[in-house]
Amino acid sequence: MNYKVYAIGNKVEKFYSDAIREYQKRLSKFCNITFSSYKNSQKLPFQDTDKYYKIVISPAGKSLSSEELAEKIKEFELTGITDILIIIGNEKIHCSDTLSISSMKMSLGLTSTIFFEQLYRAYKILNNEPYHK
């Protein structure tokens, strides 16, 4: 599975960036994942994302449990969807799906970090591995 995660808005604080890098490292045994932040959506490199299934993370999106997210990833794999673009911080971009981390508004860095943590948790579930050591 290949993921591109685009965070749109204010700068992501260093401590969140550090946490995201840690989750990228942990996720590397399950998938390929990149993280990029942009000041606004006009700067997004959409030209190379036509093949990607696009998901917006928004408080107004569909809420999933960790197990449901794991099941969604499994469905993607079974249906041949291998390239996924996650957009955090801009709810107006047209996408295939809209998911929610929480119905509460959070900072861009916190939302991004929680998304990475939940993706990692979903892969641990899919691989029948314990999450906590």
Regions found by a protein language model. Give the residues of each.
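Acidic, metal-coordinating catalytic cores used for nucleic-acid/nucleotide bond scission
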Residues: 11-14, 60-66, 92
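S-adenosyl-L-methionine/SAH cofactor-binding core of RNA-modifying enzymes
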Residues: 28-85
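Glycine-rich beta-strand-to-loop/alpha-helix junction loops that act as flexible
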Residues: 86-90
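N-terminal beta1-alpha1 ligand-phosphate binding loop
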Residues: 1-24
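Short, Lys/Arg-enriched, disordered terminal segments
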Residues: 1-5, 81, 132-133
